[in-house]
Amino acid sequence: MSSRSHAIDLPHELRQRLSGYRWHRQTIGRSQAGVFRLVADGKPALFLKCERSGPFAELADEAARLRWLAGQGIACPDVIALESHAGHDWLLMSAVAGEDLASAAIEPADVVGVMASALRGLHAIDIASCPFDHRLDQRIAAARARMEAGEVDESDFDDERQGWTAAEAFAGLLALRPATEDLVVTHGDACLPNVMAAEGRFSGFIDCGRLGVADRHQDLALACWSIRYNLGEAWIEPFLERYGPPETEPAKLSWYRLLDEFF
């Protein structure tokens, strides 16, 4: 679907910068922000995100994480501009080459191979270098804040939790909290649509607003869920085999899927 910028109250500098671009709204993914792909003859494609400003806005977080991630040598969008205007935040970024792994025309074995190697590379970064703390205490506190503010969409809960209230889900978070954390730098929303591939190879991470130091099961849980949804249950084990040790803990996979219901 195409959209025109004059229907949107853009910040002045962005309006000037984006003159002549054609706008196409993106519909894949679960981002709370409006996402547009911008194209113009003879110019590189860009992506623009827009969301309401407020205590649960994430675009400033995403910009900070993209800048940090690029500094670690991991492919991701370049931050071109971050603006606030008329009660909204705007993030303009470069496009990453290729297609996301949920859409790429490659075989399932290659999809899980790219996903595994991409996460393995991210998880190899020294956590001491990462300023974004997503350990259990911080994420449980964030989940509580979102619940108390009415920001949790109970209608979007996974099938096994349909009919639950956010309070019931939060009680489960507390009761089943993991006793240990195997800390790495995690993407935070490691689903197939957030990993890009070009010519069958990893080309970058996108939607990085929840990147931070957390248990590796944060990423493995969402990756397994996404692989099941997009490719089928049979491809989870090949993905985990390609990812390699340490062995995954089913209870942690389940807990981090529960945590994701709050975000």
Task: Name each model-derived stretch.
Residues 5-16, 121-188, 246-249:
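An alpha-helical support segment within catalytic cores of ATP-dependent transferases
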Residues 7-8, 63, 233, 237:
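Short, surface-exposed alpha-helical segments at coil->helix boundaries
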Residues 17-26:
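Conserved N-terminal boundary motif of the eukaryotic protein kinase catalytic domain
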Residues 25-132, 180:
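ATP-binding pocket architecture of kinase catalytic cores
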Residues 29-42, 46-48, 79, 168-218:
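Active-site acidic catalytic loop and adjacent metal/ATP-binding pocket
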Residues 56, 136, 182-185, 198-254, ...:
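Active-site Asp-x-Gly
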Residues 67-70, 224, 257:
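A cross-family signal for key residues in well-ordered alpha-helices
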Residues 111, 213, 260:
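Localized chelating/binding microdomains
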